[in-house]
Each structure stands twice: as structure tokens, then as C-alpha cells.
């Protein structure tokens, strides 16, 4: 390998792969091995091939403007992560109207929160409505009716009221055509209550349409599920929608406040209770919210847990989390501080939990080494079925989607996660078959694409660059809108800044990968490797797997070491498939002919070149370690059965990757290292065998085996649990990365892999 001016490492001299070879079990590839046969011609070819692998160091890889732009974007995102508080969220006109309805508790006759009334008067849209710029009929009607009602109550801005009423009259019939899946949270309770409130100030809304009758029926069903005695004594989701409800016992309800003085973090619900109780804790909560948002209030606040978790998730899936490891650790430390064995909600210290936040929190915490219990899912499960909130009538698709994602991080014996995986998988498959991938909590750019990717490429098979490439198309940035009581935006979660950095980063990585691939192709052609049975598709697959896993530009040495090792393995191991009458000649007399000399020369040369890079970078020689690693693999290739090849290949790639990365020698003798190596090689062996059988057995077309799944679960536990004396997390995760690459090629069919290769390595981002 050679280092370019751009700081990358590219192979100078690599090995070529002959069709025939002989293995000596007593002395395989010693560091002072002599090449047998007349190889002067081969050496000349080697020099020419080496030159073909060099990339012009004068090429303008480092574009100063792009680099500066990326630096600015990173700093902007880092500032967001470092300054997270209770959540950056857009204002809800509906909730602001309920806050503005509160009369001065001092008896002055005016509004208690005049700035809220001012916010409403300043934020009417041109068509007379209030609401998010994304038009959703439920959202616009609810927001507009609430704002007209409060302006009418205070006898202000008659012209704005008339304009708003005109919008309602012209559009209310369109509620019939709305998608029930996108109906705002608690709409079936909030809208009838708001109609009654509007009626008290002289605004009449017809309630005899089929839609309205259906809404009232849904309200009655929900109230039957949570009767009044339960409402007053146990925390339920109805605490989020108390506004306008009659016949409530206010003193009993005050016992169900959260620590911040709110009722399930709902400004509108809290404002309604405050109107009747003048409770000081409610007052302080509302005052804090109004001051934070300059008169307006969100539909829910705080949203700190939601913001911390979803921001980390987005950065990871976009492939840029490596820039913010310190900040991500701080985010997850914050979440873990408030984690409970009953799960979590969108805010800290809540008395109601939901499966969506719980699943997202569980998955991210587990994958970062935190100790989290599956008990968190118990209250969402009943007889093998799962719900978003205990007692609710419908499931949110994204809640089941995140439950599905969380279930794939299960350890052996975690039965509730096994049940969750089965239920959520079936739920999502049915929705996809029915073309019904629509969610009640978010309107995103490509939710069907997100769900489809998760189902088609499960966690064990999801290579980092592959996931990032798909999510770059699915993530809408600023355009993604959440559905609460009203539509709202999470400004740090769905953000064009994230998307812009992710695209620039991906393009930078892709450019490096394309240059490396061009060099490898030229090397392949110069050596005419097709003569040795190596197809260009196999060459490309080996590089793609390595580049999709070890993708960072600065890790070129590791990436190419992995790819070249896999290419060598593929070529040499393919000789085992020769007919019996020729195999003896292949394995027995290879060193006596010219091709055998080429093999030995290139294999030894590869070892020395890999080692020389480490000598330059780390100041230590790994030649003997690499040689020993290859000796073990070659011995298995000669003497072992098909069952052994996958295990041996995994061990070879693990050791080559770690030696190339400069991993400290003491790590190789660490007890955890041996555990991880055994678990990884075992499951990789099973995967290679399964992959071979799958090619001839149509019954194995989908899924894997119980033994493979159990092996992956064991490996996940070893990798993602921490102990007092442990390997560093990056080293542990490299074992999972290698197992993942084996799982990917065994799980995905050839057509899917070919399309993935094209998408990841060559397709431009729109």
C-alpha cells in the first residue's frame, strides 16, 4: 500500500490468485520463503500491476470549500446536541388558544396570558386558517376553530374571526375525506370538546354529518375504555386531552400531575385544569412554556427524551454519528438517567409510558452498552400482542416499527422480545401487503421505504453504508412533520442541516471508494485474474462488503486489507471445487509450475505490504503474525471440510482487520477477545454453510436457521454488554461487523445484492 497526498492508503503491490497451489502444513508461507520456479517475468508484471494500483496523488480530492462547509455543518449540529434542553418544537395554535382562554386569576377581567392571545392574532395564515404549512384537514380545522373561539371570547379581531369562520365553513365537509391514520392524537376527544366550547361563545358547528357521528362514537368508545373512576385515580393517556371535558373532580385530578406541574406534558390540558383550580404548579408550568415560546405553546412539552433519542437515531442512520461520539454519549447518559423498568415516554419523569419511546430508548441504550431490562415492555404486551399505550384502541405503525427494531437486539432467552419480534414483523408485513404504510404520529418523506428496508434487510444484515444510502433518500429533513394534537416540527430531529452534512459526507466517502475500485479493477485486468477463475463480480462483491462496513476515508488500509483478503480466500478456496481427478494435481504440484510461483510471490508480498504500512503508521512489524494467520487458513483449506471453511475465513478476516488497524497486541490475548473470536467464527461458519445450501435448496430461500439466530444473539450480547475489564467498544463491534457481512451475503439474494452494490458504490445522490 502507499499513502497519497490526500491521506489515503492504496495498495501498491498485492497478490494474484492462481488456480493451483500446494500447502505445506509444516511450513506455510514463512517470512523468508523463496519463490519456486522462474518468476522473473512475474516480478516484472508485479511492478507494472503495482503501478496500476497507484492513484494520482495530485487529484483534487480535498475540496476546500466542501471541507469548510462540512466543518460548519458539524459545528452547527454539535451546538444543537450540546444545547438540548426540554426540546426544540414548533408552536401549536390549538394549545395556545386554550392557554389564551384562561382568565386573569387576579380578577382583572383580561387574559392571564396576554402574549398567547397576541401570538394567535399574529399567526393567522393567508387563507384564514391557523396551523402548520403542511395542509392536513384535521389539523387546520382544529387549530382554526380553537383560535376563532378564543378571539371571539375576548371580542378581538372580528375580521380575523370572520375569515377563520369562512375557512371552517368552506372546508369542514372535507373532514369526511381525511385519512383516519393521520387523525391527530386525541382528536376524537378534543374536537367534540372544542365544539362545545365554541358553542358557549356563539359559534355553532354542525354535528349531524356521518363524520361527526363517527367521531362522537370514537369518543364514547375511548371513554368507556377509561371510565371516570379510573381517569381520576390512575395515570392514563386521557390526561393529555382533558380540555373541554365536563364533570371532572379537579382536586382528585391534581394528584395525577407530573413533577413539572403539567398533565401529561399537555399545555392545553393543563390550561383547562388551571382554569378550574388556579393551581400554582400548573401556573408555573404554563408560564414557563409561554415564556419559552414567546407567547405560543407547543402541543406537548417538554419533549426532552424524544428529542435526545430521535436525534441520535437520525444521525446514526444518516451515517454521520462518528463525528459526534462525545455528544451522543451525553445524550444517552441523559436518557439512561431517567430510564425505568416500566419504560419511558417523550419526556422525563412521566407517569405514563409509550412503546415507541421505550423501544427507541431500549435499542439505542442496549447498542451503546447500557444495562436495560426487557421488563420495560411488559405493560405493552398481552397474550402475545403489543400496543402503543396500555388500553388504546389502535396501534401506531411507527410504534410497531420501532418495537420491531428493538426486538432485533435481543439476547438469548429474552422471550418477550421474541414475542415482540414475531408480532411486530407480522403487523408490518400485513401493512405492507395492504399498501397501508401510513402512521398516526408522523408524516415523513418515505415511511414505506423505511419499513420496507427494515423488513428486507434486518439488523443482522444491515451494513452501515447500505443503511445510510437508503436513509438519505427516506429522510425528509425539515419537511418531515409529526402528528400530535396538532401537526408539529421537531427542529433538532428533522433538520436539513443533518441531511446536508450526510449527503456531503456520503459523496466524499463514495468518491474515495470509487477511486479505490477503479484501481482494483485495473489491477485485476493487468494481471488477467480472470484466468484464475476470479470473476469481476466476485472482485466487486469483496470490495463492496468491505467498503460498506469499513467506509471511513481514513480507514483505507483496513478496508483494502479486508477486501484483498476476501478476494484471495475466494480464489484459493474455489480450487476445492475442482473435479477429483484434477484436484490432486492442483494441491500437490502447484509449487512446481509458474502459476504457483506467482501465487506464493503475491501472497508473501501482500503480507509484507500490509506489514510495511503498520511499520510506517505504528512502528511495529506484523509480518509474522499475518503469515501465521494465513498458514492456519491454508491448512484448513487443505485438510478441513466445507464446515470448517467459513470459520477459518472469519478468523482470517478478523485477524487481518485487527492487525491492519494497529490493534494493540495485548488485545489478542484478552479473554473477551477469545470469546468474541469463537462466537464470531462459529456463526460465520454456519452462515457460509447455509449460504451454500441455500443455492440448491429452494426451501431455504428466506430467513436463516434457529442455530444461526441463536449464534447472532449470543454475539450481540458479547459485543454490546460491558464489564469492568473489557475490550474497547470499537474492537468488540468489529467482530459484529464481520459476522454481519457474512449474514448479509447469506440472507440477501444475488439480485438484491447487485442492486445494493450499484446504489452504494456508484449511484449519485439526488
Swiss-Prot record:
Binding site for substrate: 222, 440
Keywords: Chloroplast, Isomerase, Magnesium, Metal-binding, Plastid, Transit peptide
A GO biological-process term: terpenoid biosynthetic process
Coiled-coil positions: none
Residue stretch of the organelle transit peptide: 1-30
Cofactor(s), names only, from the UniProt record: Mg(2+)
Family designation: Belongs to the terpene synthase family. Tpsc subfamily.
Name the record gives this protein: Ent-copalyl diphosphate synthase 3
Primary gene name: CPS3
